[in-house]
Amino acid sequence: MSLSALETSINTAFDARDTVSTATKGEVRDAVEHALDMLDKGEARVAERGDDGKWTVNQWLKKAVLLSFRLNDMSTISGGPGGATWWDKVPSKFSGWGENRFRDAGFRAVPGAIVRRSAFIAKNVVLMPSFVNLGAYVDEATMVDTWVTVGSCAQIGKRVHISGGVGIGGVLEPLQAGPVIIEDDCFIGARSEVAEGVIVRRGAVLSMGVFLGASTKIIDRDSGEIFVGEVPEYSVVVPGNLPGRPLKNGQPGPSTACAVIVKRVDERTRSKTSINELLRD
């Protein structure tokens, strides 16, 4: 089946998704399985970056992921602690893998790392005990540290460091138009959250505890410029707050959380400066 035919088949099935069930056979099931297999191998991805820096979301692939929940019945999934099993519709990416398969894949997955089928993990990635949801893409030489969650269909670039306890939001629950995108060479500080389709551009640094959603204001401290939904490249970002409106009784109102760009660094400066130094200002 050609790529265009695959896309058409999945779009048509999604429009009639109320008729799709675990009993569905034939073209629809084959198309969804093919799409998930492409995602799993990194042959396709939910979002792609163009030469102009703009990201295009392949909505049909996201639809394939959603359709898989209607097609797949619940079943036992092996790999739990002490030989225990889980009960779910999405198998483990590592189901049936042996030493040769792991060596060919070229990444490390320490005990406690969970990756669902249709997520792609590139070579030289390190997965500490973490969770990578279906449809996600984690590119080469990225560190996914302990207790990180990489949400459904999230796109993580090369040489990214995602620190302990970070949450990268997904697109499926609640349903989002576009995935969270972390471009190459970014650093996401511990316990930060990036959700609701926010794009973190190349080389940006988020300090510990930065929370970014689609409506979060990201304010450049030097220029006063306000960004929403996107962190500019090579920005160093820390948590902040905006003063609230006065209450009706005249007293100061509650402040509103925001994020603050405290400085910008170019690639040359970044190569000579440690992450910790960038965060000190």
From Swiss-Prot:
Binding site for substrate: R108, D145
Stored InterPro entries: DapD_Trfase_Hexpep_rpt_fam (IPR005664), Hexapep (IPR001451), Hexapep_transf_CS (IPR018357), THP_succinylTrfase_dom1 (IPR023180), THP_succinylTrfase_N_sf (IPR037133), Trimer_LpxA-like_sf (IPR011004)
GO molecular function, one term: nucleotidyltransferase activity
Keyword hit for Cytoplasm: yes
GO cellular component terms listed in the entry, alphabetical order: cytoplasm
Main location: cytoplasm
Keyword Ribonucleoprotein in record: no
Pathway info: Amino-acid biosynthesis; L-lysine biosynthesis via DAP pathway; LL-2,6-diaminopimelate from (S)-tetrahydrodipicolinate (succinylase route): step 1/3
The entry's keywords: Acyltransferase, Amino-acid biosynthesis, Cytoplasm, Diaminopimelate biosynthesis, Lysine biosynthesis, Repeat, Transferase
GO annotation, biological process: diaminopimelate biosynthetic process; lysine biosynthetic process via diaminopimelate
Superkingdom: Bacteria
SUPFAM superfamilies: Trimeric LpxA-like enzymes
Subcellular location(s) of the protein: Cytoplasm
Catalysed reactions listed for this entry: (S)-2,3,4,5-tetrahydrodipicolinate + succinyl-CoA + H2O = (S)-2-succinylamino-6-oxoheptanedioate + CoA
Assembly and interaction partners: Homotrimer.
NCBIfam families: dapD, PRK11830.1
Family designation: Belongs to the transferase hexapeptide repeat family.
Record's protein name: 2,3,4,5-tetrahydropyridine-2,6-dicarboxylate N-succinyltransferase
